[in-house]
C-alpha cells in the first residue's frame, strides 16, 4: 500500500474499538484526511498528544481501503494545551475546526490549511481577542469558499459605498435601492469592524468597543449559518455565553 507524508492540523477525533481513534485532519497537500491512529488511546502510545484537536503535525500514513492509517506523527505546532486553558479560546477553536471540516474535502487547498493553522496559532498566543480571531477566520474562510462578503460597495448592484444596511442573504451591505423592506441598519463602526476583520486590519478591530464587537459577531454568525446551511454548534455555544455574560454584566 502506498505510503505518503504531509503536514496536517487535527480537526476532530472519535473512538474506534478499545484503543484506537479515527482522526480527521486538514492537510497541506491532500485536503481532508480521515485516518486510523492505532493504539493512540493507550497510556504508552507512541503518538502521545500529537494527534489531539488543534495540533499540527508532520504525519506519515499509508493508504487503506476505506481509511488511511497513521504510522508516524511529529509535532509542528503544539497549540492544543494553550488553547484549552481559556474557555473562550477553546470554544472559538472548536468553531474554527468545525467550519474547516464543513468547507473542505479531499481536494487540496493550501490557503484553507494555512488560514486555519494561522488562526489556531494566533489563538494559542493570545495575539487578539478570541472573538475577533474567530470572526476574522470565518469571514476569510467563507471568502475562500467563494462567498466573499462586501462591506463597502453594494453586494447586489455594486453601487459604491459606504452603505449601512446589511442583508446576509445578499452577501453584505446593500444600497437603499437594493435593500429589501425591513433590512437592518447597522452602525458605521460595526461596518468598519467587519471590513477590518475581513482584511486583517487589526488596529481597527482591537479599537472596537464591546457593543460593536457583539453586533459584528452576530452578523458574522448569521452569515456563516446562511452559507453553511446550519449553524456551527460551537459558535452557538459561544453566542449563548456572550448573551449570558452581557445579561449578568
UniProtKB/Swiss-Prot annotation:
InterPro entries, per the entry: ARFGAP/RecO (IPR037278), DNA_rep/recomb_RecO_N (IPR022572), NA-bd_OB-fold (IPR012340), RecO (IPR003717), RecO_C (IPR042242)
Q: Which UniProt keywords apply?
A: DNA damage, DNA recombination, DNA repair
UniProt GO cellular component terms? bacterial nucleoid
Q: Tell me the Gene Ontology biological-process terms attached to this UniProt entry.
A: DNA recombination; double-strand break repair
HAMAP family in UniProt: RecO
Describe the task this protein carries out.
Involved in DNA repair and RecF pathway recombination.
Q: Which family does it belong to?
A: Belongs to the RecO family.
| The name this protein goes by in its record | DNA repair protein RecO
The taxonomy runs: Bacteria, Bacillati, Actinomycetota, Actinomycetes, Micrococcales
Amino acid at each position: 500500500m502506498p505510503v505518503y507524508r504531509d503536514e496536517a492540523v487535527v480537526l476532530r477525533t472519535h473512538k474506534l474499538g478499545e484503543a484506537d481513534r479515527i482522526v480527521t485532519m486538514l492537510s497541506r497537500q491532500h485536503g481532508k484526511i480521515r485516518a486510523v491512529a492505532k493504539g493512540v488511546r493507550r497510556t504508552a502510545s507512541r503518538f502521545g498528544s500529537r494527534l489531539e484537536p488543534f495540533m499540527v503535525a508532520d504525519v506519515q500514513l499509508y493508504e487503506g481501503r476505506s481509511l488511511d492509517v497513521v504510522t508516524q506523527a511529529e509535532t509542528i505546532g503544539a497549540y492544543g494545551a494553550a488553547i484549552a486553558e481559556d474557555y473562550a479560546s477553546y470554544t472559538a477553536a472548536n468553531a474554527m475546526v468545525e467550519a474547516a471540516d464543513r468547507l473542505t474535502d479531499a481536494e487540496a487547498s493550501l490557503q484553507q490549511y494555512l488560514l486555519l493553522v494561522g488562526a489556531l496559532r494566533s489563538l494559542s498566543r493570545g495575539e487578539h481577542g478570541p472573538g475577533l480571531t474567530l470572526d476574522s477566520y470565518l469571514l476569510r474562510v467563507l471568502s475562500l469558499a467563494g462567498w466573499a462578503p462586501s462591506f463597502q460597495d453594494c453586494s447586489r448592484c455594486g453601487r459604491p459605498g459606504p452603505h449601512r444596511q446589511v442583508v446576509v442573504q445578499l452577501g453584505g451591505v446593500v444600497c437603499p435601492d437594493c435593500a429589501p423592506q425591513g433590512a437592518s441598519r447597522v452602525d458605521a463602526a460595526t461596518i468598519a469592524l467587519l471590513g477590518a476583520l475581513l482584511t486583517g486590519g487589526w488596529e481597527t478591530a482591537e479599537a472596537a468597543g464591546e457593543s460593536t464587537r457583539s453586533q459584528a459577531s452576530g452578523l458574522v454568525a448569521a452569515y456563516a449559518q446562511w452559507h453553511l446551511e446550519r449553524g456551527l454548534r460551537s459558535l452557538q455555544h459561544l453566542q449563548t455565553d456572550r448573551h449570558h455574560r452581557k445579561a449578568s454584566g
